[in-house]
Every structure is written in structure tokens, then in C-alpha cells.
């Protein structure tokens, strides 16, 4: 159970958060868009005409950013266990990514033409206990990595949220075994006290 004091502090921080205000003013659905935008501006990994797969897309902020960049010549495929309000130009599949049926459907959708970018902002429902939350998060990261390896073009990019803790170093090693380029980003919109960081990988190693 969340203590009233903690809940009140979170609400106060949320209301006064500069990125929340910017998102509301710009019509974005979440403050997390500024994490993505910062890294895109730095690394230029989404471009006009790209095909993008957005995993854990709800409420749709990252898909909003992606479709603006790829334009009508590109494509954004979004998926989440939660529904999202339609976004013009974005194809949405609702379902649990950990279920074989949803995973295989996404593979079928993307196999006809490989994707240029796989995004994953997936996170489990948090219990507040790191011993439970981090393993669940790592499982989602590993599933997203597997999807990226199977669906990306050789020079495609994989951008994934990862929580630092048990299994983090091992996941980075997994990424390095599959991609020639792996870097860690901590965007300004990611709160300093948060253990989340983002991995950006590219140059898929051919087996």
C-alpha cells in the first residue's frame, strides 16, 4: 500500500515536472517522449521513410514521435497489452507481448519487410520490490532483444529501457554479442533517482 505522504509527493512532482508541462503543451501523451527525442537528436537513429516497431507503446507518445519523423513514406507498428487511442498513420496491435500468439503475430507482420528501428519502453507492473521487479523487467528486455535480432535490418537500431540491478551487466553483454555498436544513454528527462537507462544498439552481427 502506498503511503499518503509518498503519493502526495509524487503528485506534486508530477504537476510541477517541466517535461510533463512540455508534453501537455506540445500534445504528446507522455513525458517519456523527451527521453526518446533527446537520443534521436544525438544519435539520429530514426529517419524519414523508416519502418519502426514500438513495443510497450501505451499511451502512444513514442509512436507519436516516430510517425512524425518517418512520415507517410515510413511505417510505425505499435503494440501494447493496454489499448491506445488511435494515432494517424500508426498500425496498432493490442496484446500481451509475452504470449506466443502476440509475439508470432508481430513476427509475421514484420517478416515481409525488415524494420529499421525497434523501440522498447516496456516495463512490468511495479511492486516496489526490486527483487521482483528487476527480473520481470529483464525478461521483457530479453524478449524485445530477441524480437529485434529477428526483425531488424543489418544496420537497424534497437533502443530499449533497462533498469540497473541484477542482470543488467549480463543483458549488456547479450547486446554486445549480437550488435557491433552498443551504448548507454541516460536522458535528462529520466529522473536522476531512477535506475532506468536506455541502451542503443546497431550493426547486427550476422551469424
Swiss-Prot record:
Residues bound to S-adenosyl-L-methionine: 60, 62, 80, 96, 121
GO CC annotation, single: cytoplasm
Disulfide cysteine pairs (residue numbers): none
Pfam family, one: FtsJ
UniProt-listed Enzyme Commission number(s): 2.1.1.166
GO molecular function: rRNA (uridine-2'-O-)-methyltransferase activity
Main location: cytoplasm
InterPro entries, alphabetized: RNA_methyltr_RlmE, RNA_MeTrfase_FtsJ_dom, rRNA-MeTfrase_E, SAM-dependent_MTases_sf
Active-site residues per Swiss-Prot or TrEMBL entry: 161 (proton acceptor)
Compartments (UniProt record): Cytoplasm
SUPFAM superfamilies: S-adenosyl-L-methionine-dependent methyltransferases
NCBIfam families: PRK11188.1
HAMAP family: RNA_methyltr_E
Family indicated by similarity: Belongs to the class I-like SAM-binding methyltransferase superfamily. RNA methyltransferase RlmE family.
Protein name: Ribosomal RNA large subunit methyltransferase E
Source organism per UniProt: Ruthia magnifica subsp. Calyptogena magnifica
Gene symbol of the encoding locus: rlmE
Amino acid at each position: 500500500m502506498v503511503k499518503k505522504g509518498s503519493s502526495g509527493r509524487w503528485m506534486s512532482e508530477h504537476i510541477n515536472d517541466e517535461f510533463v508541462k512540455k508534453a501537455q503543451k506540445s500534445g504528446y501523451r507522455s513525458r517519456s517522449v523527451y527521453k526518446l527525442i533527446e537520443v534521436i537528436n544525438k544519435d539520429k537513429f530514426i529517419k524519414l521513410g523508416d519502418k519502426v516497431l514500438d513495443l510497450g507503446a501505451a499511451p502512444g507518445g513514442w509512436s507519436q514521435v516516430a510517425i512524425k519523423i518517418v512520415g507517410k513514406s515510413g511505417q510505425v507498428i505499435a503494440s501494447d497489452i493496454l489499448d491506445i487511442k488511435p494515432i494517424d498513420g500508426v498500425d496498432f496491435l493490442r496484446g500481451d507481448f509475452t504470449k506466443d500468439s502476440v509475439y508470432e503475430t508481430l513476427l509475421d507482420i514484420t517478416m515481409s519487410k525488415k524494420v529499421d528501428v525497434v523501440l522498447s519502453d516496456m516495463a512490468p507492473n511495479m511492486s516496489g520490490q526490486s527483487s521482483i521487479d528487476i527480473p520481470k523487467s529483464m525478461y521483457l528486455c530479453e524478449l524485445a532483444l530477441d524480437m529485434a535480432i529477428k526483425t531488424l535490418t543489418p544496420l537497424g537500431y534497437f533502443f530499449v529501457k533497462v533498469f540497473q540491478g541484477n542482470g543488467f551487466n549480463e543483458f549488456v553483454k547479450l547486446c554486445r554479442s549480437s550488435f557491433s555498436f552498443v551504448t548507454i544513454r541516460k536522458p535528462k528527462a529520466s529522473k536522476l533517482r531512477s535506475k532506468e537507462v536506455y541502451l542503443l544498439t546497431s550493426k547486427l552481427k550476422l551469424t
